Amino acid sequence: MNSRRLVQKTLCFDKPERIPRHKGILPWAEKNYPEFVQRLHEVFPDDVVPAPSVYIEHLDTRGDRYKKGTYIDEWGCIFSNPLEGAIGIVQTPLVADWQDLDKFNPPQATLSIDREAVNAFCRQTDHFVLMGSFVRPFERFQFIRTMEHALIDLVEKPPELFELLDRIHQHYLKEVEVWASTDVDAISLMDDWGTQQGLIASPDVFRQIFLPMYKEYAEIARHHGKYLFMHSDGHIMDIMPDLIETGVDALNAQIFCMGVKELGEMYSGKITFWGEIDRQNLLPHGTRQDIQQAVYEVWLHLYQNGGVIGQCEFGLEANPENIFTVYETWDALSETERKA
């Protein structure tokens, strides 16, 4: 069974032959452990891959997203990065005063996707292919205003807030439409909604302002026969029912801070858990037995004839041997499931 079909059967809870793999390898790992990363790719090849981000028009970016220093992205948002191999944070707002809003325009170049190049890639691979960028209205709003100003805006709700959000959303609708018209298998959303204990903003803000946006992205995906994948960090238990109702097929979330058993009791069989394994404690500090037990718990509580993609992040301070153990354990559990 090829990778694309394997992932499709997983998303449909149709007894895939094994747990699909998707390694989240950050530049930090590639820089510090290049030989180990190569070994991971050879022994545990991915089943899920991103499409190439090939644009006909030039994206106006400056600097390197993962290098120490300043990086300016295609929207003009300014990121300050104190650490090599990671992503920086925005400290200077692109729209500092609402009077500056008229000067702000989303980057039209991101709509100039080279569809022929993307489609050729999809034809030549049997992997399950995600779109080559992420749709992130909540985070983009924060990048434009900074997180501090954005959260104040969501409390005060000035009319300019809704004008800005509409510009962001209308642009992302076009971007989703362009990607959905290619041969990729899935549309990708990415908004971090949680802190370690709960939501960054209230559930009402999420449901009244941002959930309708996600529903429109989902509608486009469905119209074109695409799956919908989403990443969201933090404790997002309060909005899980909304994401499932919206039509998110696979969710990459910090399942260990929410409780793997609790998630399984409520949502196993209703959504595919696209990873992960605890990257805050277990991957940096856990023993081999800790990692094996963690993977087993995910399988025990979340797997239901599918519904789990073996994903974890090889990022800052992760123990390389623990990453290897994650995928080694997933393969062992897949073998156990086949023999059952």
Language model features with spans:
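Active-site loop segments of alpha/beta catalytic cores
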Residues: 1-31, 103-340
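Short aromatic-enriched loop/helix-cap "lid" or pocket-rim segments at secondary-structure transitions
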Residues: 33-36, 62-67, 83-85, 143-144, ...
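Acidic/polar N-terminal loop/beta-strand segments that form early-domain functional surfaces
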Residues: 24-26, 54, 74, 82, ...
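Segments that shape or occlude catalytic/ligand-binding pockets
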Residues: 28-64
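N-terminal capping/small domains of soluble enzymes
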Residues: 20-24, 33, 37-40, 63-66, ...
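A contiguous, low-structure linker/loop signature
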Residues: 62-110, 124-128
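Alpha-helix termini
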Residues: 15, 25, 40, 58, ...
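An N-terminal domain-start capping segment
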Residues: 44-51, 89-104, 133-144
